[in-house]
């Protein structure tokens, strides 16, 4: 009980700060302060003083929400400060706050992508907001192309490591507070403990995920390059969110659904509708893994063997500025 109270206090201090009224990533903006203000509004809208877990549903995986207990009208995320409308296929700016296996869980029905013309800070704003609201565990799901020929359509793969080939980072230019290091250790970016929990729930593979900037698909030469670099999967999302979450001390689980063969001898022309269809068919399997992992978490949403880290990097005064609508 004492540990739970202490961990909640670590995140409860994220409740006040003055922030600029510019969008995340804009000159002069403090994205951490903006996340705190959005978290306060999230608490007001949901009636939940804190959240333990964040689950982000990728392309075509919105059906997993039903299997995770989402019901009733979702929250309109665009009504939260600095949340932009998702425009990717199969993504909706909606969320549900649910009790999942005894943990208060925020389920988000999509995400922003860099290819939508958004800054890295805008892309990771939902993740930072959930962590400011108390989430210690972040589950990121996505659809991906198979670089490794051993993978089959519909497979659920736990992300073991990643290649960030976007040429950018959500930490660039934003980390000036001494509470958190600018140079974050990414050795265990994808929690080994959470991956072990996922494998205990279902027989799933692990793999290395490469993020390309998109929106164009990869060329055969690029896929050969990715294979040579050790990638098993390729997609256009997820890595910035993982970086941002690790920077703030949260534990991250990544689950990728193989929705197509990447460019090469096995691949035909990609039909986005087909990607959504394949992902949708794997939604129950993804939900099963997520629910099983969350069931094994302690009451504050962190695995029992998780590392306890310093408080997230935020700065600002004690007075809160009214957020723009």
What do these predicted regions represent?
Residues 2-186:
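Metabolite-binding pocket within alpha/beta catalytic cores that recognizes anionic/polar moieties
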Residues 130-134, 227, 246:
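Non-catalytic positions within long, well-ordered alpha-helices that form the structural scaffold/packing
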Residues 136-137, 232, 251:
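Short acidic/polar active-site loop segments enriched in Thr and Asp
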Residues 162-216:
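Histidine/lysine/aspartate-rich catalytic loop segments that bind and position anionic ligands
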Residues 263-312:
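His/Asp/Glu-rich mid-to-C-terminal helical/loop segments that flank catalytic regions of hydrolases
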């Amino acid at each position: 009980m004492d540990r739970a109270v202490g961990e909640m206090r670590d995140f409860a201090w994220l409740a006040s700060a003055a922030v600029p009224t510019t969008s995340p990533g804009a000159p002069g903006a403090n994205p951490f302060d903006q996340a705190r203000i959005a978290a306060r509004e999230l608490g007001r809208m949901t009636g939940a003083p804190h959240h333990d877990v964040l689950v982000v549903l990728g392309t075509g995986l919105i059906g997993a929400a039903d299997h995770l207990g989402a019901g009733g009208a979702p929250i309109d995320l665009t009504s939260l400060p600095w949340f932009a409308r998702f425009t990717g296929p199969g993504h909706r700016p909606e969320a549900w706050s649910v009790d999942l296996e005894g943990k208060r869980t925020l389920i988000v029905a999509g995400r922003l992508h860099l290819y939508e013309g958004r800054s890295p800070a805008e892309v990771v704003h939902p993740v930072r907001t959930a962590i400011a609201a108390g989430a210690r565990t972040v589950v990121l799901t996505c659809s991906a192309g198979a670089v490794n020929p051993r993978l089959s359509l519909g497979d659920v793969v736990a992300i073991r490591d990643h290649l960030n080939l976007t040429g950018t980072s959500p930490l660039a230019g934003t980390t000036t507070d001494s509470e958190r290091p600018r140079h974050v250790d990414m050795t265990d970016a994808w929690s080994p403990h959470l991956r072990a929990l996922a494998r205990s729930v279902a027989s799933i593979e692990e793999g290395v995920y490469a993020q390309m900037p998109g929106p164009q698909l990869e060329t055969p030469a690029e896929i050969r390059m990715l294979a040579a670099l050790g990638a098993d999967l390729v997609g256009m999302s997820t890595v910035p969110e993982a970086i941002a979450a690790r920077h703030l001390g949260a534990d991250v689980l990544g689950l990728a659904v193989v929705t197509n063969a990447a460019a090469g001898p096995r691949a035909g022309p990609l039909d986005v509708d087909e990607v959504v269809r394949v992902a949708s068919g794997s939604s129950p399997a993804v939900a099963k893994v997520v629910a099983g992992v969350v069931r094994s978490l302690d009451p504050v949403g962190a695995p029992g063997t998780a590392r306890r880290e310093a408080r997230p990097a935020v700065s600002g005064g004690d007075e809160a500025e009214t957020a723009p609508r």
